[in-house]
UniProtKB/Swiss-Prot annotation:
Source organism phylogeny: Eukaryota, Metazoa, Chordata, Craniata, Vertebrata
Domain named C-type lysozyme: residues: 19-148
Protein name: Lysozyme C
Provenance organism: Pongo pygmaeus
GO molecular function, one term: lysozyme activity
Key words, A-Z: Antimicrobial, Bacteriolytic enzyme, Disulfide bond, Glycosidase, Hydrolase, Secreted, Signal
Amino acid sequence: MKALIILGLVLLSVTVQSKVFERCELARTLKRLGMDGYRGISLANWMCLAKWESGYNTRATNYNPGDRSTDYGIFQINSRYWCNDGKTPGAVNACHLSCSALLQDNIADAVACAKRVVRDPQGIRAWVAWRNRCQNRDVRQYVQGCGV
């Protein structure tokens, strides 16, 4: 019985751990997934966005009480428009995926959804953190020394 309790605690701790990317590790991953120059957006801008939205944390979430939506994952993609979390009223799910897919350590789904977001007229300006922290700023520091 004691072994089952310990096993349960170990499994629980594994499921709640998140991956927080190192800066250059994320830069290389985003480059490999085709983000550098996607829709004219530099890799440095994507890195700045991820830094200020999630701190490079794949499991970051942020509840928005005003519209009862939640932002998910490394890019803080919103459940009102882009994914289905089963609890956001009037959700659109334009990325056609579960919001839990945006919380995975493998960020391929998050990248695919971010690419979908920037195909809309707002582009990268859809992210408030990008507008406040990255727009019209020198963002080269986010990829400096990463060899990308």
